[in-house]
Amino acid sequence: GEFPAFGDSQTRAIGTPDEGKTSWAVGDELLLEMTSKTLGTKYAAFKYNGSSWELASGELSYKEDEVPTFPHVYYAPNYKWETGKLVLKEGKVAGTDEYIEGKAEITPNGQGITVKFSGATRNYSRLRIATMPNMQITVSINRYIPAGSSKKIGLRNYALTSDEKGNAYLYGTFENNSEV
């Protein structure tokens, strides 16, 4: 969204709905975990090329006569699969992008995977900071749990870069008396 968001005539207040990401962009990734009764658990990343999803890393395999399950599917741009665990990509910092879990299932013909985020909800806050476009800023934060983590962070500085509309974001859970 732009600032002010969605054509509002004034700055938004706490509690104003923010729909967040509403469409896929080239380069977006989905992280899937698939379990096959015969072949076990496999992990893969799929990347959006503008019209379809392509396997970027990992593998998903199962026997023709079984229906695999997908215990987890994530849209978490800062993360990657590493030996069956989600870990931060090099140079990425927890809490500076989304971490949303969706649902997935194999299509009836076994030729595709249907991924849904329609029932997904953020279990964290998204704090938008309005500044100048494409500007680096430093934000100090205290008593905060970044999205995708269970570790509470004490006083820490975050280096953020605003987008072309002047928005920078933090994603996480803010405790009572958190400071930004």
Can you name each region flagged by the protein language model?
Residues 1-180:
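Sec-type signal peptide cleavage vicinity
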